[in-house]
Amino acid sequence: MDYLRFVGDSTPAIRLERWTQADLSLLRATNTPEMTEHLGGPETESQILGRHRRYLELSDPSAGQMLAVAMPDGQRAGVIGYWERPWRDGLTYETGWSVLPVFQGQGVATAAARAVARLAGAQRRHGHLHAFPSVDHPASNAICRKAGFTLVGETHIEYPPGSVMRCNEWRLNL
């Protein structure tokens, strides 16, 4: 399997592996009330299947990609990716992640965020990577800070579609 391995200074070694058909079970594992509390709640099975299809189709790294976060022993720890989005007066990259509870609090999400920033930056397509965690989600905001993002300020984005979410805008220079 193709993968990229990253080791951070004090963060755990992780692998970012390309999204495959087998990762549908990982997507379902992240679709719990606890994991989606700050994202509008769990999705229906139909929505999960649609998301999985979109993740599989996002295969041009310059436009973005979704990746499984894997531990050195192969265990799936979560999901991360980056994709293009319109923002302010142009296009930029956005990132988002979800790490399973058993792997939370160990630096896995921070390592994954740093790794995905390197991947996005290697595309040399956009100058910034943005993250938009809910203002009410201290863990995701802390991950942004630890991964080197700069807090721009509070904003509102539409997520999930049809809902406006109050979030912090974090930006990382690529």
Residue ranges and their predicted role:
Residues 35-54:
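Conserved GNAT-fold acetyl-CoA-binding loop/helix
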Residues 55-68:
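A short helix-loop-beta-strand connector motif used in the catalytic cores of GNAT acetyltransferases and
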Residues 49, 53-57, 100, 121:
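Solvent-exposed, non-membrane alpha-helical residues enriched in polar/charged side chains
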Residues 45-50, 58-60, 112-113, 160-164:
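Short C-terminal domain-edge/linker segments immediately following a structured domain
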Residues 1-38, 66-174:
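Acyl-donor (CoA/ACP) binding surface of acyl/acetyltransferases
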